[in-house]
């Protein structure tokens, strides 16, 4: 296996066509086809399948291309630094469910390292996309939660994708609302008291199974339910409609502001919030620093305990 073959495979996966990839690589199509066939025979894996839509990656091919991109990018870093004498920025990317504390931890980590020598990316997104981003190497780390309801299904998916989940903290469930809500001053709230107020839930797109919901008690039959795509819209709905959502109780006023509060839900439900990463791939210095920043929020989790 050569670096050239890896570059060829990556180009084919991005072009979706042997003919187009050959043009981009400035080689003949038969030569490219032979190089890909030799690579597949050497590693014993079928990387591509032909279809009416062109060349498609197989599941094994998707995983291989993810690793191939890492190898090629590392080579390019070495080449730029030691051959071309360029100063190359180190990269770090994280994907997460909609957690303000995870975003704020990212902010604090970036402040430590600065932007001159590093290139950062943060993706606050849907549950399945968090998993997919880590699987495909788009992000080094994913932040999400497990509980008794979704643990078996998601853990099985993690295993299929060669991913590992590590718990950071475990906490009870809280009702998040604005401070002007009629129930905001209560010490605890039960589900019956919330019946007349709209429950706000993050939209999960085509992966809208209960197991991918970002909120616990996803199978509960709410009388009023509103789906939203982003946190800003959800906060506006809390104020405008006295809406609420269920959360971890980790308050982060730095980003959401001081107009909101979390009240304990009368429930035995627990959330296990942690990080997802690729099995066998070491976490980078930037990744570890980010996790260190998240760990600082353990003490801010209402009623939580550290794992």
Feature-to-residue mapping (PLM):
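Alpha-helical linker/hinge and terminal dimerization helices associated
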Residues: 42, 64-86
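A short LG(V/I)-centered, amphipathic sequence patch enriched
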Residues: 40-57
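Short helix-boundary/capping micro-motifs
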Residues: 10-28
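Hydrophobic hinge/microswitch elements
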Residues: 135-140, 145, 204-261
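Secondary-structure junction motif
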Residues: 102-108, 147, 151, 190-191, ...
């Amino acid at each position: 296996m050569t670096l050239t073959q890896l570059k060829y495979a990556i180009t084919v996966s991005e072009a979706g066509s042997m003919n187009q990839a050959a043009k981009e690589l400035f080689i003949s199509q038969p030569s490219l086809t032979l190089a890909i066939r030799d690579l597949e025979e050497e590693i014993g894996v079928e990387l591509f399948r032909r279809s009416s839509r062109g060349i498609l990656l197989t599941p094994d091919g998707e995983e291989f291309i993810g690793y191939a991109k890492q190898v090629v990018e590392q080579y390019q870093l070495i080449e730029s630094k030691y051959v071309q004498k360029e100063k190359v920025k180190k990269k770090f990317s994280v994907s997460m469910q909609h957690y303000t504390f995870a975003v704020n931890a990212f902010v604090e980590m970036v402040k430590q390292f600065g932007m001159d020598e590093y290139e950062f990316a943060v993706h606050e997104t849907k549950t399945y996309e968090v998993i997919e981003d880590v699987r495909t190497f788009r992000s080094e780390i994913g932040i999400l939660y497990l509980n008794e309801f979704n643990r078996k299904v998601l853990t099985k998916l993690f295993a299929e994708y060669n991913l590992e989940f590590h718990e950071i903290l475990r906490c009870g469930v809280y009702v998040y609302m604005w401070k002007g809500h009629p129930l905001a001053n209560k010490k605890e709230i039960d589900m019956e008291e919330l019946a007349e107020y709209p429950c706000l839930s993050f939209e999960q797109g085509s992966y809208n199974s209960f197991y991918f919901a970002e909120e616990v008690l996803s199978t509960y039959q709410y009388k009023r339910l509103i789906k939203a795509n982003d946190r800003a819209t959800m906060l506006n709905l809390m104020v405008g409609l006295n809406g609420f959502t269920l959360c971890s109780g980790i308050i982060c006023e730095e980003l959401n502001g001081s107009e909101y509060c979390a009240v304990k839900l009368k429930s035995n439900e627990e959330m296990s919030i942690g990080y997802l990463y690729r099995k066998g791939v070491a976490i980078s210095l930037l990744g570890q620093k980010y996790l260190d920043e998240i760990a600082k929020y353990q003490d801010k989790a209402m009623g939580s305990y550290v794992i």
